């Protein structure tokens, strides 16, 4: 049970779990986030520890269409959080929209803030029900998706 391993809750240790090491997850996480940082650097934001150095301030809008799992890899990197906590405790319905913005509150230093997560108002606006996908049963006896 992943909830029993404290490392999963820590940004800099979640990948130390034996199953994660066996699957070489940290290598792939670093590959993905490294490429993501290259995209951000092309727009003037260079990763420096847990924040970004602003080398070219701008108001660019970057849009990424991605799967729930990849989305949380990118967001966990931007917010310096363990993706395990995000993967297992937050749910984004298919076609939902998550918005983050960069904030340069001190000259030359930027961070990212999540302004909205899993927004599905576009579905409600057109009387479309949200999908149950990515969710699990509320009660174990329910006839819905289990672990």
What are these regions (language model features)?
Residues 1-43:
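Phosphate-handling substructures
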